[in-house]
């Protein structure tokens, strides 16, 4: 059975500052965070996730939790909103330990707290992270893989592709909100990249890419699958692979990053 999350041996709350922000496409931005405290981060690559703490609009300082375990949630919730930061889960896109920097990529959309922060952030602004480990686990018996996600899963999938053997047959299905957010990148030799945008088809998040997976010719097995994004996309891909393709449940990692119509509490 593939473990859902692999945590590092030790974790700490890490306070950093914004070094740079760059818009990659109209709907995607990259924020570089840095600082000497990054020496406490154990970089594992793949889909390594962190809790990102960032100030609410109007807060001049960042008040981080002080406990380096899951009790941080209770510690955060007792803070009044006047000093409580926002927190969201993101993937480390790149890590440069020698420079004391990490890059985090964001899908920027609508009037959401995270998107608004990305739009207004400037160098020197505070931010913090807490390591949440990795969930990608390629079994030794896998002879190919399938990666599926919407725009919220794109940074994780790109990071996974950075670390796989170039010869591993990989079918990669990526959905973004608009064609303007499709971008070129250097993929491993064994990977085939399939882009889809919702402005060319069904506007429901995940519907276009899920239908594409159902119609696709996949690599011969045994297969490993990793899928994430809107909750119904992740569960739909898993159900299809298990029921229609015969992929064992233990060889599928799936994660509902968000649910349509439901906001993340803060």
Where in this protein do the model-derived segments appear?
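Extended, composition-driven regions rather than compact fold-specific motifs
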Residues: 1-266
């Amino acid at each position: 059975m593939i473990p859902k999350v692999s945590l590092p041996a030790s974790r700490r709350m890490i306070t950093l500052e914004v070094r740079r922000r760059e818009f990659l496409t109209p709907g995607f931005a990259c924020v570089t965070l840095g600082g000497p405290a990054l020496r406490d981060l154990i970089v594992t690559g793949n889909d390594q996730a962190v809790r990102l703490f960032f100030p609410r609009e109007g807060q001049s300082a960042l008040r981080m939790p002080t406990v380096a375990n899951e009790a941080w949630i209770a510690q955060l919730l007792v803070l009044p909103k006047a000093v409580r930061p926002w927190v969201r889960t993101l993937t480390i896109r790149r890590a440069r330990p020698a420079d004391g920097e990490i890059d985090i990529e964001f899908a920027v959309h609508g009037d959401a707290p995270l998107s608004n922060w990305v739009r207004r952030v400037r160098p020197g602004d505070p931010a913090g992270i807490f390591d949440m480990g990795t969930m990608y686990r390629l079994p030794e018996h896998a002879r190919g893989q399938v990666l599926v996600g919407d725009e919220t899963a794109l940074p994780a999938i790109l990071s996974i592709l950075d670390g796989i053997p170039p010869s591993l047959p990989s079918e990669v299905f990526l959905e973004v909100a608009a064609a303007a957010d499709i971008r070129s990148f250097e993929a491993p030799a064994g990977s085939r990249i399939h882009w889809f945008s919702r402005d060319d088809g069904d506007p429901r998040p995940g519907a276009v890419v899920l239908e594409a997976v159902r119609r696709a010719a996949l690599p011969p097995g045994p297969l490993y699958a990793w899928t994430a994004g809107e909750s119904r996309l992740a569960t739909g891909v898993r159900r299809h692979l298990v029921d229609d393709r015969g992929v064992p449940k233990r060889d599928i990692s799936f994660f509902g990053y968000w649910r349509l119509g439901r906001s993340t509490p803060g």
